[in-house]
Amino acid sequence: MTQQLQNIIDTAWENRASLSPSAAPREVQDAVEHVIAELDAGKLRVATREGVGQWTVHQWIKKAVLLSFRLKDNELIEAGSLGFYDKVPTKFAGRSAAEMAATGVRVVPPAVARRGSFIAKGAILMPSYVNIGAYVDEGTMVDTWATVGSCAQVGKHVHLSGGVGLGGVLEPLQANPTIIEDNCFIGARSEIVEGVIVEENSVISMGVYIGQSTPIYDRATDTVSYGRVPAGSVVVSGSLPKGDGKYSMYAAIIVKKVDAKTRSTTSLNDLLRD
């Protein structure tokens, strides 16, 4: 079934210029809808973990997400006295109290998650935004005004602090999703974008910005890397000298490995997850 779906999506992607809500084969519409429904239920995901820092990205699923915009017209979405006009409905629209209780998710108004995102049991959405294709795993808190971009992958027991931004893949078009692995703490107003991977048990301090071109300097080893924060790192914003010391440029600095003191200041509060 999965291989058949992939073949349909890949073929439709090659012919995407000819697709529209009124001009798409039923087979393509059904395949795209099936993928979105499976993403919404957490049965499919854009990327799957093979080990620490090791991920397989399923490009055909990302293509299905993009095709879904090609196959839908905008429609009126109402929420009380508010009105919206979009192609993607919200994730929890029309659910009863019993159905919401069964998800094990707490959603604080006016948090928004789009259909096609998955929010696992024990997760908390403060007034925040989770885009289509994103995966938020168990026990994670998405704090106030944080944004989980399209197809971003967030692990178990992660804390995304207020105003954190995780980049998406839809616009500008990115090859790989942004990934935050299990037990990470992302400090307020930090931005992780462009498919950067933050490996498990890491702590990103407040106001750190990391994209694929951001130097990540490890002061313990005096090395620079890009696109990946090693497991168990504590990262702050800083700069590195350039041009024979004439100027400096922004960098993310790994100042140490996570220790007991770090954990005590970034631990999750179980009282908030009852």
From Swiss-Prot:
Enzyme class: transferase
Binding residues annotated for substrate, in chain numbering: 106, 143
UniProt feature coiled coil, ranges: none
Gene3D superfamilies to which the protein is assigned, alphabetical: Hexapeptide repeat proteins, Tetrahydrodipicolinate-N-succinyltransferase, N-terminal domain
BP terms from Gene Ontology: diaminopimelate biosynthetic process; lysine biosynthetic process via diaminopimelate
InterPro entries: DapD_Trfase_Hexpep_rpt_fam, Hexapep, Hexapep_transf_CS, THP_succinylTrfase_dom1, THP_succinylTrfase_N_sf, Trimer_LpxA-like_sf
Pathway membership, UniProt: Amino-acid biosynthesis; L-lysine biosynthesis via DAP pathway; LL-2,6-diaminopimelate from (S)-tetrahydrodipicolinate (succinylase route): step 1/3
Cell location: Cytoplasm
HAMAP family: DapD (MF_00811)
PANTHER family, sorted: 2,3,4,5-TETRAHYDROPYRIDINE-2,6-DICARBOXYLATE N-SUCCINYLTRANSFERASE, MOLYBDENUM COFACTOR GUANYLYLTRANSFERASE
Family recorded in the similarity comment: Belongs to the transferase hexapeptide repeat family.
Protein name: 2,3,4,5-tetrahydropyridine-2,6-dicarboxylate N-succinyltransferase
Source species of the chain: Paracidovorax citrulli (strain AAC00-1) (Acidovorax citrulli)
Lineage: Bacteria, Pseudomonadati, Pseudomonadota, Betaproteobacteria, Burkholderiales
This protein's encoding gene: dapD
